[in-house]
A protein has these predicted regions:
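Beta-strand-rich extracellular passenger or scaffold domains
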Residues: 123-125, 146-150, 171-172, 195
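Intrinsically disordered, low-complexity linker/propeptide segments enriched in Ser/Thr/Gly/Pro
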Residues: 138, 144, 172, 180, ...
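Periodically patterned hydrophobic/aromatic "hotspot" residues that form packing/interaction faces
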Residues: 102, 125, 150, 163, ...
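Extracytoplasmic cysteine-anchoring/structural motifs
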Residues: 1-31
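Extracellular beta-strand-rich, repetitive "passenger/adhesive" scaffolds
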Residues: 72, 93-97, 115-120, 138-146, ...
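Conserved hydrophobic beta-strand positions in leucine-rich repeat
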Residues: 64-69, 90-92, 102, 111-115, ...
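N-terminal capping/linker segments that flank leucine-rich repeat
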Residues: 29-108, 126-131, 154-156, 167, ...
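Short, surface-exposed linear segments at secondary-structure transitions and domain or protein termini
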Residues: 12-23, 87, 110, 133-136, ...
Length: 203
């Protein structure tokens, strides 16, 4: 009847529906969810454009640079870093000595990766297939580093490779990457016996 048709709702429709179907209140997607606490705080401070305490898809796509100077403490994990498809620069220095795992092969726009000290890294590091990567720097500061393999294959724009203090490093794969390297620095890596640098343009 007319009374029902003209009646105003005093309870928001979404709230009423939630009660009817016994579901929790809908929340917008947060692409910073589950990330390392200090890294998440940094991302929200730099890229949360509307200040709602969440990272929307659009805000995640605006992330192009991550610098450790903005972190409030140490970063133990870079899990979910693949959520930022436009990330170009990743620099985590002095805050990542407990960093234990990282995969960057899905961040296709990366041009620079710098991690120091990365003492907690696991046995292997995959940075392969990054067509825009020009600079890779990885440094360790103690004798307990367990990293034994670095995969830098198929990075055709690579110009600078720096690896220091990787006491357990045995394999550095530069297949499909070596021909463009202009600076290659390998220091204090006693278990590293062979590196194929035939493609490198070294005089």
């Amino acid at each position: 009847n007319k009374e029902i048709l003209t009646r105003k709702f005093t309870t928001p429709l979404t709230t009423a529906a939630n009660k009817l179907y016994n579901v929790t209140e809908f929340k917008a997607e947060d692409l910073s969810s589950g990330m390392d606490t200090n890294l998440r705080a940094y991302l929200l401070s730099e890229y949360d454009a509307n200040g709602d305490g969440l990272l929307s898809q659009a805000e995640a796509e605006s992330v192009t640079e991550i610098y450790s100077t903005g972190f409030g403490g140490k970063v133990k994990s870079l899990m979910y870093i693949e959520r930022f498809p436009n990330l170009e620069v990743l620099v985590v220095n002095s805050n990542c000595d407990e960093l234990n795992g990282i995969t960057l092969s899905n961040n296709k726009k990366l041009t620079r990766v710098s991690l120091s000290p990365a003492n907690g890294l696991w046995s292997s590091l995959n940075v392969s297939g990054l067509e825009n990567l020009t600079t890779f720097e990885l440094k360790f500061s103690n004798d307990q580093a367990n990293l034994s393999k670095i995969n830098l294959s198929n990075c055709p724009a690579l110009k600078k490779v720096v690896v220091e203090g990787a006491k357990s490093l045995e394999t550095l794969d530069l297949t499909g990457s070596a021909s463009t390297v202009e600076m290659f620095w390998l220091q204090s890596c006693p278990k590293m016996t062979t590196v194929d640098i035939q493609e490198m343009p070294i005089n």
